[in-house]
């Protein structure tokens, strides 16, 4: 793709997201979503092959269905309230339809089926945009309508998303699919807290984006797409491979890494709201995520593949691309746990 075209497309994606975030009028929000969706399809099809075309088609159909459902919910709400303002949701059916549409855009269970398939069919760069930037717009709308959301519906979706995110990643060897299932689980944690403490959801989303960006950028540095290729990278890029494994443990929520902060704070907040069973179930199902990350770490770092002496020396001669943003991203993605007491202002 030519640089001027790429710049225009990326600018359109960013503009669409900003329109959604800054609007209080449902029609403008819908226009922002459509701009975002139509602009990202060329990014998904950057590597022109049947897999990318299939992934783009699946993404388009899912997002178009979600947009249609959102507009139906907005129309029903307009009939009852007579207003396009986002804060005036007076009809419970409209609220359920809007929530369903936004969760479909995010890839929450039971509308999660498109996320692993689309992520697997596209490049690492496109996958990074899909699993980070594309989550911001729907989450910002959920944040704004959180007082009107049906809590029981969203909590059920959150619990099943955490379960599906852990269960689906267990037998995966493709790194992009592992990241996709991890994304589903993280979205579940965010959905669980949004009706009780929306500000904590913003913290969770920020940390998730930081960790996912860092992980994808490291995958791109050493061109790893499977667990086997990651294992072979140990001799060529030992430092980068070590960073990937630490980031994956952070994504799994293992203390003392940054990924433990949102899980800790969400469980604490739900417990304060007299909910015991749901946070307990979520904590237990989160162990599935941690298990497949630990298994990946063990198979990559603690068991060495048979290699010659020449292979062991490769790291001294390999040229590593410069990545200026990576060091601060990795530090924030792994070492923020000591700052947790400062986050008490979110309560």
From Swiss-Prot:
Major place of residence: mitochondrion
GO cellular component, one term: mitochondrial inner membrane
UniProt keyword terms in alphabetical order: Electron transport, Membrane, Mitochondrion, Mitochondrion inner membrane, NAD, Respiratory chain, Translocase, Transmembrane, Transmembrane helix, Transport, Ubiquinone
GO MF assignments: NADH dehydrogenase (ubiquinone) activity
Location of this chain's protein in the cell: Mitochondrion inner membrane
Electron transport recorded as keyword: yes
Catalytic activity reported: a ubiquinone + NADH + 5 H(+)(in) = a ubiquinol + NAD(+) + 4 H(+)(out)
TM regions (residue ranges): 3-23, 25-45, 66-86, 111-131, 149-169, 178-198, 201-221, 237-257, 274-294, 325-345
Stored Pfam families: NADH_dehy_S2_C, Proton_antipo_M
EC number: 7.1.1.2
Record GO biological process: mitochondrial electron transport, NADH to ubiquinone; mitochondrial respiratory chain complex I assembly
Signal peptide coordinates: none
Enzyme class: translocase
Lipid bilayer topology: Multi-pass membrane protein
Function: Core subunit of the mitochondrial membrane respiratory chain NADH dehydrogenase (Complex I) which catalyzes electron transfer from NADH through the respiratory chain, using ubiquinone as an electron acceptor. Essential for the catalytic activity and assembly of complex I.
Family that this chain belongs to: Belongs to the complex I subunit 2 family.
Subunit structure: Core subunit of respiratory chain NADH dehydrogenase (Complex I) which is composed of 45 different subunits. Interacts with TMEM242.
Name of protein: NADH-ubiquinone oxidoreductase chain 2
Annotated source species: Canis lupus familiaris
Gene: MT-ND2
